[in-house]
Amino acid sequence: MKVAIIQHVIRQDDLNWNLQHVSELMDKQAGADLFVLSETFATGFMAEGTADKAGMQGMMVLKWMQRQASRLNAAIAGSVATRDDDGKLRNRLYFVRPDGFFDHYDKRHLFSFAGETKEYVAGDRRVVVHWRGVSFLLQVCYDLRFPVFSRSRDDYDAIIYVANWPEPRRDVWQTLLKARALENQCYVIGVNRVGGDSACEYQGDSVILNAYGRAVAKCVPGKVDTAVALLDMYELHRFRQKFPVLADADDFLLASEQKFL
């Protein structure tokens, strides 16, 4: 599995420019099986009072992802602000395949510090997707701080984190990505934006870590960049069998799962 991480600038609310920018960067890694973009890659993180506009653009962005996935014969992962039939906004991570079919995960942990809880509804589903022999757990930005929600049940090979993670907390980003890889014995794909907006600057630090917590691909911090890595499933499963930490993990159910019992 060849995974390309796309570390890109986001112009706030400039949908057409952002989509063209990302498309050009993806072309540099043509041949990848999966392209991972940032959180809200087409618009930027929406502040209070502006998310309604982004919600109207959600379907446009999804259709663009479907066209790009078909053109590149690859899956594409990235989050957008979207409005469902219930009228509520969600920070939705789409995983789109070349045939147009897609899965989605709605961000579970909303960033109340930045007002996300005032605009969006939190998701309640834990989502694992399967693509070309690899299983991915989908996560968005702030979810990284809550390890119980991403705890492995031996049901995925890699975690995808897409983010708008600010530069002042870059050490947290780097530390927690490594922790998630080590504790879950999995690959971790973390993609963050670069540039700035009215709130802060973003350093990127996009990376792919293996189950040993070592970087197998990384983008240049603070720069528009792309990187690619091969996910080696044979080596991952060999490591898990040789050092079976997950067999000793605690059993648990998330609160949202109790209602299904």
What are these regions (language model features)?
Residues 84-154, 168-175, 238-245, 255:
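Active-site catalytic loop in hydrolytic enzyme cores
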Residues 1-5:
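Extreme N-terminal starter segment of soluble prokaryotic enzymes
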Residues 128-130, 193-261:
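C-terminal beta-strand edge segments of enzyme domains
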